[in-house]
Design a protein with these regions (language model features):
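Short acidic-hydrophobic, aromatic-tinged amphipathic segments that line or gate anion-handling sites
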Residues: 1-8, 172-177, 297-302
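N-terminal Rossmann-like NAD(P)+-binding subdomain of aldehyde/semialdehyde dehydrogenases
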Residues: 1-117
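Flexible, glycine/charged-enriched surface loops at secondary-structure junctions
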Residues: 95-101, 255-260, 280-291, 321, ...
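Conserved small-residue-rich beta-alpha loop and adjacent elements
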Residues: 102-164
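Conserved NAD(P)+-binding/catalytic subdomain of aldehyde/semialdehyde dehydrogenases
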Residues: 169-256
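A conserved active-site cap/scaffold subdomain adjacent to cofactor or substrate pockets
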Residues: 221-293, 297
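C-terminal core of ALDH-fold dehydrogenases
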Residues: 303, 311-430
Length: 431
């Protein structure tokens, strides 16, 4: 079905000359932080950020000054976003319940929902002070009940970012960025405690560092550049389509923004509209380059092909602009987050509507969803078996163990079934 689509505008593709030494560079950073601790952090801070904080941890005085310096409306808007994310996370957590079930008489199985004890939230710097970034990683951790939540952000970050980290609920905040921050949270230093899980997006160095420390700690995901795709029919408004694509394109020159539509007229008008809006967009240097490199417009034959294309793309943000967007959306299965109808702009989720904006990219939506409160808890099973249940479980376990040749397993099962023969069983007299 996908071989029948046609392109009004094709993407150029990502730069094939990626830094092939990135893995080695990040590995060296991690190893140095592991062995040298804060000394390495100071060296990397000087090298990459051109500033070395007097202390890495943000003091109570610095937090107070950041809050004091925050514009009143900006604070209200940040608190609004925090409350929205908290409400949705609380509602999501409420869908996860402890379980206790008796599957056979005397055989009791269950699970508990246990918060991850310590979480490290990486807060990116980048070209903009994205005040919603700490909200998305910190607030769900507070809702989940994590005992210690730390945040790391580059030392040159805007003071408002520190203020929002505090408002969102971080227990401790550190002025350390990049791969060195990931290493510090994974292994611990004199100043920064090690954590159980690291969440939050970052640049290529941060992403690679998260990949390398996975296993030592848990991670949420490996995030690539931002993505937006809209599927649309002839009822869509090209002005809105263009505006939403450019809103994402201003993130980064590697952003992927696209449209798939059943209408050639909509496709061509949207292409023209992008150029018209770029002419007056203050961030056109970034957005225009992203559009030139990665922008695409695809013409599909019908809605079935639109849906197939959307599932194939498995994009981070998927907008649905059709006559019956809810009916269309119900047929789609691969997306990071779904934006149903033209009123549901990706921008609203990016900033404040309440769904988490940390989402799978690079087609990872085929097998995972985005960051949510469930990422901060463990669903851990348990079992207990009373006397009534022992025969039902022990007898097949004994037979299976014997078939597999696992005599230690067989013995451990059999002593439950025949406790009066425990000495004979454990000394091999019953083998």
């Amino acid at each position: 079905m996908l071989n029948k689509v046609s392109w009004i505008k094709r993407p150029q593709g990502q730069d094939a000359q990626a830094d092939r030494s990135l893995t080695e560079k990040v590995s060296a950073i991690i190893e140095r932080v592991k062995t040298e601790g804060d000394t390495a952090l100071r060296a990397f801070s000087q090298q990459f950020d051109k500033v070395v904080p007097a202390q890495f941890e943000v003091s109570e005085q610095e937090i107070a000054e950041a809050l004091e310096g925050m514009d009143a409306q900006t604070r209200r808007d940040s608190e609004f976003a925090i409350n929205q994310v908290r409400r949705f996370a609380q509602a999501q957590l409420a869908t996860m319940q402890p379980l206790e079930v008796e599957t056979l008489p005397g055989v009791h199985l269950g699970h508990r929902i246990i918060p991850v004890q310590t979480v490290g939230c990486y807060v990116p710097g980048g070209r903009y002070p994205i005040l919603s970034a700490p909200v998305m990683s910190i607030v769900p951790a507070t809702v989940a009940g994590c005992e210690q939540i730390i945040a790391c952000l580059p030392p040159g970050a805007h003071p408002a970012m520190i203020a929002v980290c505090h408002l969102a609920g971080a227990h401790r905040i550190f002025k350390v960025g990049g791969a060195q921050a990931i290493a510090a949270m994974a292994w611990g230093t004199e100043s920064i405690p090690s954590v159980d899980k690291i969440v939050g997006p970052g640049n290529a160095f941060v992403n690679e560092a998260k990949r390398q420390v996975f296993g030592r700690v848990g991670i949420d995901a490996l995030a690539g550049p931002s993505e937006i795709f809209t599927i649309a029919d002839d009822s869509a408004d090209p002005r809105i389509l263009a505006a939403d694509m450019l809103a994402q394109a201003e993130h980064d020159i590697h952003t992927r923004a696209g449209l798939a539509t059943t209408s050639r007229d909509i496709a061509e008008r949207t292409l023209a509209e992008v150029e018209r809006q770029l002419a007056s967009l203050p961030t056109a240097a970034t957005a225009g380059e992203a559009w030139r490199r990665q922008g695409e417009i695809v013409l599909c034959e019908d809605e079935a092909q639109l849906i197939a294309f959307a599932d194939h793309m498995a994009t981070e943000h998927l907008q649905v602009h059709t006559r019956d967007p809810h009916a269309t959306a119900a047929k789609i299965r691969n997306y990071g987050s779904l934006f149903i109808g033209q009123n549901a702009s990706v921008v609203f989720s990016d900033k404040c509507c309440g769904t988490n904006h940390t989402l799978p990219t690079m087609a990872a939506a085929r097998y995972t969803g985005g960051l949510w409160v469930g990422a901060y808890v463990k669903i851990c099973t348990h079992q207990w078996i009373d006397e009534q249940g022992i025969p039902a479980i022990a007898e097949p376990a004994i037979r299976q163990s014997r078939t597999e040749g696992m005599q230690g397993h067989r013995r451990a099962a059999e002593i439950r079934l025949r406790p009066q023969d425990i000495d004979a069983i454990t000394t091999g007299m019953r083998d």
